Amino acid sequence: MTLVSFFSFLSKPLIMLLSNSSWRLSQPSFLLVGIPGLEESQHWIALPLGILYLLALVGNVTILFIIWMDPSLHQSMYLFLSMLAAIDLVLASSTAPKALAVLLVHAHEIGYIVCLIQMFFIHAFSSMESGVLVAMALDRYVAICHPLHHSTILHPGVIGRIGMVVLVRGLLLLIPFPILLGTLIFCQATIIGHAYCEHMAVVKLACSETTVNRAYGLTMALLVIGLDVLAIGVSYAHILQAVLKVPGSEARLKAFSTCGSHICVILVFYVPGIFSFLTHRFGHHVPHHVHVLLATRYLLMPPALNPLVYGVKTQQIRQRVLRVFTQKD
């Protein structure tokens, strides 16, 4: 299934739902400002964003291709990595094309339903990425703490079920976002001070009651991120405890190195995301263009950097990438 057909497959049920006659489809289109206050510099800002998007496309497609073509990589660690790469492709492609169009060719208008669909994709796949990071932490825990039972605990059937749980969780928890927004009335300006349809930026434009929208958004952020970070923390606490019992510093270092790439990916995803979330909701003295830059780059940095992290720090991936690009025939 291609990326375009995947978008179409997931979008059709949402479009049908949003097209229901009970929805306020008379709402006008939104206008995406881009980076407020930096209009004269937007072409230059688009350059690093375009580079990040290109890195995300090339890197994640390469990861998927290598894992797909090499049967020796059809193990839990690499299957979870392929899930992460697929999610990153969708996440980056949900944000970057429209953001770049706004910054480069001033295509500011975005349809009401298209805006809600983009918002759903961004938040749903961010939730899925967080879920996959939890699954990867579980994989590292089993590999280090129960190495003899790793293949029996995390066999392909279990991995498939974990992937399905991650997918369903992301869809079910985030589908209320566009549904709740569809009940709001936008009777004033519909100018979004972002380069994409950010949830709270759209909620703030409504002139009807938004308490439920705000409460649900905050609850989902705390629930998803809070529980996922807790699960990852517990996994690594057990890993640390097990590694410290390993005799010999070299053996301990080798055990830690197997977790290095995953820890880097966790930091790349959660640290900027939590910082962006906190500054957006509580950083009232932070300039708005800083909010927008943080939020936009946060959505593109993990998809761009994750393949580089795994390419550099994972020997099997690195060797196969070099083999692909150095083949004579």
From Swiss-Prot:
Chain ranges on the Cytoplasmic side, renumbered to this chain: 65-72, 139-157, 236-255, 313-329
Extracellular topological domain: 1-43, 94-117, 179-214, 277-291
Single GO MF descriptor: G protein-coupled receptor activity
Record keywords: Cell membrane, Disulfide bond, G-protein coupled receptor, Glycoprotein, Membrane, Olfaction, Receptor, Sensory transduction, Transducer, Transmembrane, Transmembrane helix
Family: Belongs to the G-protein coupled receptor 1 family.
Pfam families in the cross-refs: 7tm_4
Alphabetical list of SUPFAM superfamilies matching this protein: Family A G protein-coupled receptor-like
Gene3D superfamilies: Rhodopsin 7-helix transmembrane proteins
Record-level GO cellular component terms: plasma membrane
Primary localization class, coarse: membrane
InterPro entries reported for this sequence: GPCR_Rhodpsn, GPCR_Rhodpsn_7TM, Olfact_rcpt, OR51/52/56-like
Entry superkingdom: Eukaryota
Membrane topology summary: Multi-pass membrane protein
Compartment(s) where it occurs, according to its Swiss-Prot or TrEMBL record: Cell membrane
Cystine pairs: 115-207
Listed transmembrane segments: 44-64, 73-93, 118-138, 158-178, 215-235, 256-276, 292-312
Species this chain originates from: Homo sapiens
Function per UniProt: Odorant receptor.
Entry protein name: Olfactory receptor 52L1
Residues modified by glycosylation: 20
